[in-house]
Each structure stands twice: as structure tokens, then as C-alpha cells.
Amino acid sequence: MIRSLAVSFALLAPFACADEPKKPEVKPPAFAVEVAAIQQDVQKKLEPIYKDFDAAKTERERDAIVAKSLVEADKLYPPAYERAMKLLRPNAADPATIAGLSWVCNSRDPALQMEVVGLLRRHHLVYPETITFAANRARSGNAWIQGLLREQFASPDLPEDQAWKVHLALAMCLQSQAQLPARLADASESDARQFDRVFGKERVAEMKKFDSAKLELESLKLFKEVGEKYPKQVVIPGLTVGQMATSSIFEIEHLGVGKVAPEIVGEDLDGAKFKLSDYRGQVVMLSFWASWCGPCMGLIPHERELVAKYKARPFTLVGVNGDPDKKELKAVLETNKITWRSFWAGDKGPEGPIPMTWNVNMWPTLYVIDAEGVIRSKMALGATLDARIEEWVKKAEAKK
């Protein structure tokens, strides 16, 4: 998954395609039709901005488009949400409100969010649609999400065919919240501004104080439980609960800052075998990228600059490429002057063995690994990334 227009939507929502029980088609009530029309009207007005974002070639261009989108969103969404709520409040007990309430919960107004979550809890706590709504926000960082998932998890009315989803989502939620303090510390100026704008400065201050060790320990326990109980349950086609649990457990146990980076053994884009440990003694920036990922390609110019800047110093850029068709990559490499080596993830692309083992759920994903092979940074971008690299390159030079 690539970065989108706001931090809250750059996080994995793996249940969007999960199979739901098929229900007979029922004509929606008039209020639900009106709410859907309000939503479609806003989306239509923002569509040109989304297209501009997809076409942007540099991080600076994307930052400008994000800034523009936030200004437009501030104009369009609040009145649209209020119009929708005037239709939804009187009908809150009707299951047909779930889709509309789920949409309104994207509001950045904490009071409105809590009102919506309160209505969902009161009337539709364990409906499949509400469970999917909560599961898809498991990694969103919203203040209410952990409480909602815990309430669903503990409910005696939780349907058996939905239990796996809540179990997995709660594990994901706790893992994500455990990572937030480090992620905020490494956030670029652009991402930091977006975090403040999406969640509010008070909420971001709370996130920075999360007890990462406690949250991580509980998430690890939940991942082990759900992986053992529902190993073959399909989350989306080609991805099972067992696979997700295994990747997440591996990330928690082996991919934290301060831990030795696991070995990667694979082939580069020319088919030659190599290992991550081949670069021991140098600081490594490990970049998970793909040509289908706009933000990944937007980073290429800066990555070229880093390669040139550190040419005579102990630094190496190593990629992990997620394109399923290696043959088409030759033109991409030549056009973008990509000279550094990349592991190829295989013909399954982002679901290949390396990205799956490293639990990569957002593209690009960047690691800074020091000369001793220890992970020193995850997901840093912009000036923060540059500072991390310079810090550890200097330390590597000092040891020589």
C-alpha cells in the first residue's frame, strides 16, 4: 500500500476486501440514499486533486498537493458531515446508517467522532459492517479505536464468523500504537504536520507517551493466539490470518529499532545472488520500492543524491523491489538512473517472500541499518532520514 493524502489513510486496511456474508439486495431507505449522494458529491469535487497527487513526480509536488487538499477538505467535509448527521441521528438504530456513520467518522472533529462511535457501539456493535469498519481503522491511531475493538472482542454477542477479524484487528491496533512513539520521533516535517492536522496536537502528544513495550507484548500474545486459532482464514485473496500473524510476530521479535537486522538472501534484478550481510561495515538504507508506487518513485531523485553524496563514505543504498514483472523494470531503471542494487521480491510482487517476512504494509518502507547490522531507524523521511544516515555514517567512520 502507498502513501495517500493524509497520514491516517496511509495505514493498512487489510479487511476492505474480506469476504462478507452475501445478503439479499434490499432497497436502501431514502435517508441512506441522500447520505450516499452527499458523500459522492464531496468525492467528485476532490477527484481532480487526487489525480494530481497520483501524477506528482516529487515529494515537494506531493506536499503542495496535500496542503491544497487539506484546505479544500476543510471547506467541503465539515458541512457535508453535518448534513449527513441530520439524516443519520434520527435513524441511528437502523442498520442502514452504518455506512454513513462510518464515513462521518473520518471527521477530524473529536466530538463528532465520539458521537458517531457512540451510536455504533449502542446500536450496531457487532454487526459485520461495524466490525469491518473498526478493523479497517485498526492502524489509524484514532483515540477510540482500541476501546471499540476491545468492546467487540469481549462481547458475548460477537458472531463466530467475525471473531477472527476482531481478534486480528485488535492485535494490529496494539502493534501499530506501540510503533507510534518511534514513528513520530522519525517523522519528516511534512508528516509531522499531517499528524498534527489529522489527529490534533493534543492527541499526537498522547501518542508520543504510549507504553510501547506493554502494547507490543499484548499484541504479540494476540497475534500468536489468532495465528494458532484461525491459520487458514482468508483475509484477502492470497493472504491468510496465519500469514499475517507470522509476519507481524517476526516484525515484533526481529525488526524493532535496536535489533540486529535479519538476513536477506535473494537475487538482484539481473538474477545474481547476494545477501544483505554482504554490506556489513557500511550503513545501509534498505528501501522497499516499486514502480507502481508513486511515492516510491518520487523518492528516487533524493535516493540518487544520497548515493552520490556518500559515494566515498561507508554507506550503501539497497532496494527491495516489489514489481511482479522483472522484465519491464529495465526501462524504469534506465529512465530513472537507478544504479543501486535491489533484491527482487518475486513474481508475487508486494506479497513476495521478502516483503511478507518483513511485514511491509506501506510502500515505500525505509530502514536505516548501522555498520554493525543493527536497525537504527524505521520509516524516517526527509530531513529526519538524512540526519539518521549522517549520524550513523559518522559513527562508522569513527570506528575505522
Across the structure, where does each feature detected by a protein language model lie?
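N-proximal helix/coil linker or "cap" segments that precede and/or mark the start of modular domains
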Residues: 193-269, 277-280, 331-334
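Short pre-active-site segment immediately N-terminal to redox-active cysteine/selenocysteine motifs
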Residues: 282-284, 289-292, 362
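Conserved redox-active cysteine motifs that mediate thiol-disulfide chemistry
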Residues: 288-305
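Thiol/disulfide oxidoreductase modules built on the thioredoxin-like
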Residues: 298, 334-338, 345-390
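Conserved helix-turn-beta segment immediately C-terminal to the redox Cys motif
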Residues: 300-320
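Thiol-based oxidoreductase modules, predominantly thioredoxin-like and allied folds used
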Residues: 313-328, 338-349
